[in-house]
Design a protein with these regions (language model features):
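One-carbon transfer enzymes
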Residues: 1-152
């Protein structure tokens, strides 16, 4: 899984994995920030900090590909990973990267989706899981879900 600073999606996926509600294995967590090392350790999942900047992006993505190969990541999940992946990286992992996006795509693409929804007067947003392509938030949609709120 790839994650940046916001940990709610990562926490939810790790919890679901721990209780058996998420099939498969979590082979590792990669982040461009150092924040989630202790959380990964608590779940017994390898953690890799790969900082990224505009200048270091090619080296960071090469290191990411090395981890994908070394740990045999079958699928790369972007769990609030707030970096745009290069076309080159997307081409090297076709159909193997999915993103969890906090809106009903194709509406409200990119990082400022809550502001976009607010500006348009939208009262309810949900989440979309989609395959990642070189075009931001344009990949084939796997699933859309409304918020899982309850009144309990």
């Amino acid at each position: 899984m790839l994650v940046s600073r916001e940990g709610h999606c990562l926490n939810d996926l790790l919890y679901r994995w721990r209780i058996g509600a998420l099939s498969g294995d979590i082979a590792g967590i990669v982040s461009n920030h150092p924040d989630f090392g202790p959380l990964a350790t608590a779940y017994g999942v390898p953690y890799h900090h790969l900082p990224v900047s505009a200048e270091s992006r090619p080296q960071q993505e090469a290191a990411l590909l090395d981890l994908v190969d070394r740990y045999d990541f079958g699928l790369v999940v972007l769990a609030r990973y707030m970096q745009v992946l290069s076309a080159r990286l997307c081409a090297q992992l076709p159909g193997r990267i999915i993103s969890i996006h906090h809106s009903f795509l194709p509406s409200f693409k990119g990082a400022r989706l809550y502001q976009q929804a607010y500006d348009r007067g939208v009262k309810l947003i949900g989440a979309t899981a989609h395959y990642v392509t070189a075009d931001l938030d344009e990949g084939p949609i796997m699933s859309r879900r409304p918020p899982g709120w309850t009144t309990r």
